[in-house]
Amino acid sequence: MQSWSRVYCSLAKRGHFNRISHGLQGLSAVPLRTYADQPIDADVTVIGSGPGGYVAAIKAAQLGFKTVCVEKNETLGGTCLNVGCIPSKALLNNSHYYHMAHGKDFASRGIEMSEVRLNLDKMMEQKSTAVKALTGGIAHLFKQNKVVHVNGYGKITGKNQVTATKADGGTQVIDTKNILIATGSEVTPFPGIMIDEDTIVSSTGALSLKKVPEKMVVIGAGVIGVELGSVWQRLGADVTAVEFLGHVGGVGIDMEISKNFQRILQKQGFKFKLNTKVTGATKKSDGKIDVSIEAASGGKAEVITCDVLLVCIGRRPFTKNLGLEELGIELDPRGRIPVNTRFQTKIPNIYAIGDVVAGPMLAHKAEDEGIICVEGMAGGAVHIDYNCVPSVIYTHPEVAWVGKSEEQLKEEGIEYKVGKFPFAANSRAKTNADTDGMVKILGQKSTDRVLGAHILGPGAGGMVNEAALALEYGASCEDIARVCHAHPTLSEAFREANLAASFGKSINF
């Protein structure tokens, strides 16, 4: 999300937006947050201002569409920016620094401190400062690109009409040629466990705890569970994650990577109970919570007591009170809006992107869909290869992957070869004393084409983008191995793994 903001700000300062050629109507001059007696006329109305919605709105305006973005919350940016990706990364980053200083890491580097104290209020303040700057950045981009921001709960009240209802009951009608639904997702509730965002919390509450709990239980060891569990474990909590599946890291992660990832997290002090289900939770008179668990296949019950219970069992599409039923748009069995390859619903001028449609619930996937969708409205080509959408877990070390896992290739009967390179053999990782993990490359046996990349280690989230580029343009393992990579860098491990996949041997391992 930050990268888009920087690009747009940079382009705007240089005046590029004014030079974009198009054959459409001029941009809207309606001021932001307008509430008028008369309807607003628009070419495109976007409902939701998360990563998919705000990027789509800006792109639509750049293409010459008169654009309105309706957002129910006071701040722009959706879940990702306000209570998701952005604040969690601030806490992950700062808790990692604290963990390094508080443990033996700094001392081993010759940095000695007599006393290290945690100021949780200050840490939360830094998180909020980052969020505020980025939400304000989107508002600035809307103004710069002449996107009309209407604050209110958007409902589709006709195939060419959206009505926004604000908190005081006032309404604004938007008459529009096209409607783009980008309302995102919400936390999936756990049956029988009531979230109070105090001691029984969702990911939202876990980002704003007032103190470090002595003991925390996390339901779910997927991406969100291990990220937020890591934050509080680093800050001093005794954290146990209970996971129904037999591995950590969620859906799509390569099993070899998952096992190594779990081992590293356990070494840091994170505890796991895999193949285990939560059957209930009871709040006691002393404020503590008894969490009942048993084997996923059934068996003897066990109780774990904690101060904070974090529920992280996933997210579900948010389509509440959108007016879909009245329009005859039915949801699929998983609550998603069915769309075609151009992101059109059964009503051709009503589109949907992001978490409300099929595919991974990722901010960058929503961004891509938003851009491609509005380009399609303007007559452009519409194409997205979901196999090239990367996934990242922002723990330390990071985990990132794109393309197929070994398990998927075996299931699909595709013959493949494997190239691996450990960070322990990478010079930059050695100098940084940060050598856990490896790069694993999967290439097609017959063609050498890259089929998947799986990275566990420092900087994995940045490195995976090189793999995504390779997959998007059909590169071979040899193609990557022959690209000169700067030395000493962590990305040399990526080159070496591709060399091992293509040639059978790496140079430095």
Swiss-Prot record:
Cellular localization per UniProt: Mitochondrion matrix; Nucleus; Cell projection, Cilium, Flagellum; Cytoplasmic vesicle, Secretory vesicle, Acrosome
Disulphide bridges, residue numbers: 80-85
Reactions the enzyme catalyzes: N(6)-[(R)-dihydrolipoyl]-L-lysyl-[protein] + NAD(+) = N(6)-[(R)-lipoyl]-L-lysyl-[protein] + NADH + H(+)
Gene Ontology CC terms: acrosomal vesicle; mitochondrial matrix; mitochondrion; motile cilium; nucleus; oxoglutarate dehydrogenase complex
Swiss-Prot/TrEMBL keywords: Acetylation, Cell projection, Cilium, Cytoplasmic vesicle, Disulfide bond, FAD, Flagellum, Flavoprotein, Mitochondrion, NAD, Nucleus, Oxidoreductase, Phosphoprotein, Redox-active center, Transit peptide
Record-annotated site: Important for interaction with PDHX and activity of pyruvate dehydrogenase complex: 448, 473
PTM sites of type N6-acetyllysine: 66, 104, 122, 132, 143, 346, 410, 417, 420, 505
Amino-acid positions noted as binding FAD in the UniProt annotation, renumbered to this chain: 71-80, 89, 154, 183-185, 355, 361-364
Protein family (similarity comment): Belongs to the class-I pyridine nucleotide-disulfide oxidoreductase family.
Protein name: Dihydrolipoyl dehydrogenase, mitochondrial
Protein source organism: Pongo abelii
